[in-house]
């Protein structure tokens, strides 16, 4: 019986093997052990494409060629299918249709016959007539197909896995020589031993290395909510003549680009002094700006706790005449931290190698700033060391200095910002070794905020991932767990959670990624609206601060309004952009849900948004509420997978919301109050493109006149140009938008002088180009002053007098034709009435065009974020370290938040 049972199993395995690798062609695969299992002399399960042992150890699973002894794929069928799929995907990314490429071997009777001469010439490409497997042929095909970007295409976008692994190993080697400044907090228990801290250090260095792998941005997922596009016009404009034209010779742009080098020099300055502190008055200004502009929206720091725990040990008591989001209430100078509290600083003995003079100056009653200042006067810097008890205060102060100084990016000094951040990361290991994990979470959240503003290692996506893991590990999303803590701790936990929630929803919405914590798992209440001066550690009579009314003004109304708009935005993204999202049962259809969401958005703007400084208890710029209001309407009624076409109502709402967004950013630019640079670039470019889309396609007079379109177009370009030097993707977006806006305006507002019809030529696109070229000579369609922005209000008269931006339309439309199906344009008529579709076309033709428009918007929705999101990913998400931020080149093929630190 046992023998029969064994034979039965063997028979089953044999039947499985006969099925082969591919169910479609029935090719039997060789059942042989892999190389590693052979060398280890262990049983191989012979699974494809990798055995379980190799997959578990994350090592290549290959076989040995019995003839040559060299490594070979375990299945050539799997290998060739994968290789072909990769090449076809890369060709599509570069605008080449793989299905139109014909080889020498015919596949159907309609193909060209076999050419023996071509087959014989293959032997010249490699030994024994075999094509080389080093990627050169793939490089050649991709570069050949990428005709619209014939200028320098960096080879990094096609780096082989071997190259990426080498880069990762080099980073790991270099990171061992550093001081652990790139660490991330893990989610384990408090760090009470050196072994646990060392384990955390190694783990987070690996995360940092993962975040710096310079793989192609196309390998990084960017979802539908990251942006929309309108067909091949966008694709052509973003790849057309990027390295030619007036911008290359623009000295102003070249000077702006020099700022990248300043940031890199600050990151690598060998004379860096980690102990240096700004003067007290400068520190007070930056801290005040941080609390008004950033902490008011994300109240992760309790004001009095911050002053008592971090500021006073370094600078001494705070000046009561300086408000910290406390214009109407003041600061509670009697705030105390009980020694038994979990929030008290656990000091350690002073280092023994510090001189006697420094010991005296470092007494309990003397702030460390006085000690440091004294050491500078008597030239004792070489022997001064920072006591361990000041490491965490140094981190918090310096990262807040960096954020506070960078909130007005057009005024800030990029070198100073980088230096403050570098000092903070010098002491970040002490933060992650703290027994207070809420403190570690708050510090990491500050790093996330900085990473949104400036390049950082690891990037914001990986830092935010660590924050989310720690948040879930602490149970901050669950109100049930919060009930186990005292009122003050419960309040801090709620505040930290909603800060994490806001940042997660913001980042994921911009880049179309799944949210870190699902809505159905969140039960945590909103934090209290009381001002921080009324929330103390010593009041044991209060059970829950969130239950108390707030009779006095408080900046918490700003944060609460931001929490609510993030929830609305998250609902929009989840319903309209997530492929598997379900509509709430109380709604009959998507349109009824959208109307209800629109009404909810209006209620938020009219009721929840504070209307004056007195209510906000500080001078927070309320323009950020306008920005979120317009942005939310844009994503609610703009193109999305659930609404790939727009009706008249959507066209009207999106037109108004995009103009509102452009006005807000232009106002911030004029007043030099833009911050969070890459978010501003991303939002401004996407909004500008959406504005052009609406004006290009909308009918029934739902569009702006030529003068108005030109005015808003220049506003977009002014903002993008002023951000060059602070965000590397700004120049790419500036050039692409400049080209596309000129073409769209000429297409939309051209005047037809030829009565013979616009498609008299055999090439419809070339015919359009000829007409546009003649029109360009007669009309000043679009002109831009590339001089330095002088901070003056937009002058329409001066704008109309400027020389037009000359676009070689013959070349543009020739390039456009390469990526468009000409038959799609056969019924197009750019008439004087601005009708895109010929009114005399048949019903069937119109239906076909509508179907094509539906598919077009659905299929190529990712074109725009190749310019912003792809480049932003490379710059801020997987940025390489070692101070090379200012030197990295930009590839056009690879490729929101601003007043004084406002977060859009």
Swiss-Prot record:
Top-rank taxon: Eukaryota
Lineage of the organism: Eukaryota, Fungi, Dikarya, Ascomycota, Saccharomycotina
Function: Positive regulator of URA1 and URA3 expression.
Positions annotated to bind Zn(2+) 2: 34, 51, 54, 61
Oligomer status and interactors: Binds DNA as a homodimer.
Keyword Protein transport: no
CDD domains, per database record: fungal_TF_MHR (cd12148), GAL4 (cd00067), ZIP_Ppr1 (cd14723)
Localization in the cell: Nucleus
UniProt keyword annotations, A-Z: Activator, DNA-binding, Metal-binding, Nucleus, Pyrimidine biosynthesis, Transcription, Transcription regulation, Zinc
One Gene Ontology CC term in the entry: nucleus
Gene from which the chain derives: PPR1
Region (Disordered): 1-27, 883-904
InterPro entries to which the protein is assigned, alphabetical: bZIP_sf (IPR046347), Transcription_factor_dom_fun (IPR007219), Yeast_MetPath_Reg (IPR052202), Zn2-C6_fun-type_DNA-bd_sf (IPR036864), Zn2Cys6_DnaBD (IPR001138)
Name of the protein in its database record: Pyrimidine pathway regulatory protein 1
Any GO BP: positive regulation of transcription by RNA polymerase II
């Amino acid at each position: 019986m046992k023998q029969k049972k064994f034979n039965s199993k063997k028979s089953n395995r044999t039947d499985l093997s006969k099925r082969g690798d591919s169910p479609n062609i029935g090719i039997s695969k060789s059942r042989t052990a892999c190389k590693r299992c052979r060398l280890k002399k262990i049983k191989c399960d012979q699974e494809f494409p990798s055995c379980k042992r190799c997959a578990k150890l994350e090592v290549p699973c290959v076989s040995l060629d019995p003839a040559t002894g060299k490594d070979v794929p375990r299945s050539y069928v799997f290998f060739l299918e994968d290789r072909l799929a990769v090449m076809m995907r890369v060709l599509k990314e570069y605008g080449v249709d793989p299905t139109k490429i014909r080889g020498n071997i015919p596949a159907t009777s309609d193909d060209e016959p076999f050419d023996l001469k071509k087959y014989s010439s293959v032997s010249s490409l490699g030994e024994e007539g075999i094509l080389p497997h080093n990627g050169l042929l793939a490089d050649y095909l991709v570069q050949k197909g990428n005709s619209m970007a014939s200028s320098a295409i960096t080879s990094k976008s096609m780096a082989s896995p071997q190259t990426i692994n080498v880069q990762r190993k080099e980073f790991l080697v270099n990171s061992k020589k550093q001081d652990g400044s790139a660490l991330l907090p893990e989610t384990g228990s408090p760090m009470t031993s050196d072994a646990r801290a060392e384990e955390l250090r190694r783990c987070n260095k690996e995360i940092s290395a993962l975040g710096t792998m310079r793989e192609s941005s196309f390998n990084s997922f960017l979802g539908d909510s990251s942006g929309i596009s309108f067909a091949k016009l966008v694709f052509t404009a973003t790849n057309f003549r990027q390295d030619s034209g007036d911008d290359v010779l623009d000295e102003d742009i070249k000077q702006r680009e020099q700022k990248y080098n300043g940031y890199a020099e600050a990151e690598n300055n060998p004379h860096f002094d980690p102990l240096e502190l700004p003067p007290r008055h400068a520190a007070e200004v930056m801290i005040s700006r941080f609390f008004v502009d950033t902490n008011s929206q994300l109240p992760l720091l309790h004001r009095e706790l911050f002053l008592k725990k971090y500021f006073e040990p370094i600078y001494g008591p705070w000046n009561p005449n300086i408000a910290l989001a406390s214009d109407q209430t003041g600061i509670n100078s009697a705030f105390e931290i009980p020694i038994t509290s979990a929030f008290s600083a656990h000091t350690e003995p002073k280092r023994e190698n510090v001189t006697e003079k420094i010991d005296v100056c470092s007494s309990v009653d003397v702030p460390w700033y006085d000690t440091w200042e004294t050491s500078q006067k008597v030239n004792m810097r070489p022997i001064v060391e920072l006591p361990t008890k000041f490491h965490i205060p140094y981190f918090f102060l310096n990262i807040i200095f960096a954020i506070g100084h960078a909130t007005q990016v057009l005024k800030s000094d990029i070198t100073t910002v980088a230096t403050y951040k570098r000092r903070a990361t010098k002491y970040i290991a002490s933060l992650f070794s703290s027994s207070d994990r809420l403190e570690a979470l708050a510090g990491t959240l500050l790093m996330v905020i900085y990473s949104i503003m400036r390049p950082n290692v690891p990037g914001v996506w990986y830092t935010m991932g660590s924050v989310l893991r720690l948040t879930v590990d602490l149970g901050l999303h669950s109100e049930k767990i919060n009930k186990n803590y005292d009122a003050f701790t419960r309040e801090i936990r709620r505040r930290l959670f909603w800060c994490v929630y806001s940042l997660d929803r913001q980042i994921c919405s911009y880049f179309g990624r799944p949210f870190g914590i699902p809505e159905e798992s969140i039960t945590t209440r909103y934090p209290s609206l009381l001002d921080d001066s009324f929330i103390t550690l010593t009041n044991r009579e209060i059970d829950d601060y969130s239950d108390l009314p707030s009779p006095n003004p408080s900046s918490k109304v700003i944060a609460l309004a931001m929490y609510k708009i993030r929830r609305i935005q998250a609902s929009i993204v989840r319903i309209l952009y997530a492929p598997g999202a379900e509509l709430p049962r109380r709604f009959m259809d998507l349109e009824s849900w959208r109307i209800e969401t629109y009404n909810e958005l209006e209620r938020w703007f009219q009721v929840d948004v504070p209307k004056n400084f007195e209510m906000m208890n500080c001078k927070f710029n309320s323009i950020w509420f306008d920005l979120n209001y317009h942005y939310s309407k844009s994503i609610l009624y703009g193109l999305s997978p659930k609404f790939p076409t727009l009706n008249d109502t959507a066209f009207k709402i999106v037109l108004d919301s995009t103009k509102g967004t452009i006005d807000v950013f232009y106002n911030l630019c004029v007043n030099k109050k833009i911050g969070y640079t890459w978010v501003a670039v991303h939002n401004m470019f996407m909004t500008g493109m959406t504005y052009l889309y609406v004006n290009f396609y909308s009918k029934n007079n739902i569009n702006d006149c030529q003068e108005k379109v030109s005015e808003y177009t220049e506003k977009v370009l002014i903002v993008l140009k002023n951000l060059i030097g602070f965000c590397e993707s700004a120049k790419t977006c500036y050039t692409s938008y400049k080209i596309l806006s000129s073409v769209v305006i000429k297409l939309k507002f051209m005047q037809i002088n030829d009565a013979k019809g616009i498609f008299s030529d055999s090439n419809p696109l070339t015919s359009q180009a000829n007409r546009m070229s003649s029109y360009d000579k007669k009309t000043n369609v679009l002109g831009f002053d590339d001089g330095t922005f002088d901070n003056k209000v937009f002058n329409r008269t001066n704008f109309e007098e400027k020389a037009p931006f000359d676009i070689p339309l013959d070349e543009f439309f020739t390039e456009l034709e390469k990526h468009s199906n000409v038959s799609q344009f056969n019924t197009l008529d750019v008439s004087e009435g601005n009708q895109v579709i010929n009114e005399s076309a048949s019903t069937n033709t119109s239906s076909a065009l509508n179907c094509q428009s539906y598919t077009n918007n659905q299929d190529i929705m990712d074109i725009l974020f190749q310019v912003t999101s792809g480049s932003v990913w490379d710059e801020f998400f997987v940025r390489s370290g070692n101070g090379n931020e200012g030197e990295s080149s930009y590839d056009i093929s690879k490729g929101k938040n601003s007043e004084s630190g406002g977060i859009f």
